[in-house]
Amino acid sequence: MAKLTKRMRVIREKVDVTKEYEINEAVALLQELATAKFVESVDVAVNLGIDARKSDQNVRGATVLPHGTGRDIRVAVFTQGANAEAAKEAGADIVGMEDLAEQVKKGEMNFDVVVASPDAMRVVGQLGTILGPRGLMPNPKVGTVTPNVAEAVKNAKAGQVRYRNDKNGIIHTTIGKANFSAEQIKENLEALLVALKKAKPSSAKGTFLKKVSISTTMGAGVAVDQASLNTQA
C-alpha cells in the first residue's frame, strides 16, 4: 500500500467524510489544510440529479461570480470593425480575425477565454479541432458567441465561470482562491448554485442539487450542508 504523505494523514485526521459541514466551517477547514507553497484554488463539485446519458438533461452555461475567481483572465476576441474597437475598450487582450486564426494555428494561444461575434464564426469554425479539445471553442450557450463582444469580455474579466456536467452528472468548476474570505467563497458558491438551479432541465426529476463538495487544489473534498447556504433564486 502506498505510504500516505504527511499532508494526506492530516487531511484524514481532520476531515470527516461522512459529515456535511456548515459552509463557514467547511471553508475554515479547507484554509487550515491549504498548506501548498502557492495560493490554492477553491474548487467545487456539484452532483446533479440528472441522467447525463440523455441530451435533454445535460446542464451547460456560465455565470459571473460576485467576487471573481482570483485569476487574471486573458481574453481573445474574433471580430472586426466597430466591434473590434469595443472589445479593446472593454479590456480584450487580443483582437483579430484571420491574423488571430493564424496565431492559433501556430500554437500561440496565450489566452484563457475566446469570444467571437457571429460574423467571425466562419473563421473560428476552422479552428474547432484546436480550440475544442482545450475547452476554448466559443459557444452561444455560454455567451461567448455574441454580437455584444464588449459585454462578453467584461464578464470574462469579472470572473465568469463556465460549467458543464460530466458523464456522471457532476459539475466541476473553480469558485475562488484559498486566501478569499469565508464570506466571499460562500457568496460565490451561492451564485453558482442559483445559476445551476435556474438551468435545471424540465425533464430532471427529484432532488436536483444532490451533493455539494468544495476542495482546494491539493486537498480533499469537504461536503457542504446546503441548509447553510442561501440559494433562493
Curated annotation (Swiss-Prot):
Keywords: Repressor, Ribonucleoprotein, Ribosomal protein, RNA-binding, rRNA-binding, Translation regulation, tRNA-binding. It holds the Pfam family Ribosomal_L1. It comes from the Bacteria. Coiled coil: none annotated. Disulfide bonds: none annotated. One of its GO terms (biological process) is regulation of translation. One of its GO terms (molecular function) is rRNA binding. One of its GO terms (cellular component) is cytosolic large ribosomal subunit. InterPro entries: Ribosom_uL1_bac-type (IPR005878), Ribosomal_uL1 (IPR002143), Ribosomal_uL1-like (IPR023674), Ribosomal_uL1/biogenesis (IPR028364), Ribosomal_uL1_3-a/b-sand (IPR016095), Ribosomal_uL1_CS (IPR023673). Belongs to the universal ribosomal protein uL1 family. Binds directly to 23S rRNA. The L1 stalk is quite mobile in the ribosome, and is involved in E site tRNA release. HAMAP family: Ribosomal_uL1_B. Part of the 50S ribosomal subunit. This is Large ribosomal subunit protein uL1. It comes from Vibrio parahaemolyticus serotype O3:K6 (strain RIMD 2210633). The lineage of its organism: Bacteria, Pseudomonadati, Pseudomonadota, Gammaproteobacteria, Vibrionales.
